[in-house]
Amino acid sequence: MKKMIDIDFGSTRYDELVELRYKILLEPLGLKFLDAHRAKEMNYLHIGCIEALDDKLIGGLMLAPIDNETVRLMEVCVETKYQREGIGRAMVQYAEKCAKEVGYSKMVMHARLTAVHFYEKCGFHQEGDIFEEQGLTFARMIKDL
């Protein structure tokens, strides 16, 4: 059974989430996770998905406030062997619920082109032109909550 959890910044579980993000999102591209990133993440909401039977973190994401209405969905990742089981979608839905509960009405994100279809199935739509950031190509996506 899978369970969504809130993760406290600086906790052991947060460190596990950083490791998972690095393994799934950065390492395959030859990118590094910099300690400077941690300072920015202090005020973000960190969400994880655990395998309830063994308490193992198998997915996670972050929500970064942009303004009083808008939150940015960031670094959605799922452990490779659990991908294509609906965990990513469930985490995004949980993140939307959390964002709405604290008063956000809009969620934005930068999706890698390979993930655009996934986010469209989650109700996001593309806004603006495709762009590059840190050598990767992204689509800006948005969803009203």
Residue ranges of each PLM-predicted region?
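A short beta-loop-alpha structural element at the N-terminal edge
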Residues: 2-17
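Conserved beta-strand in the GNAT
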Residues: 48, 55-64, 70-77
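Conserved acetyl-CoA-binding loop-helix of GNAT-fold acetyltransferases
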Residues: 78, 84-97
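Conserved catalytic-core motifs of GNAT/GCN5-like acyltransferases
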Residues: 108-110, 125-140
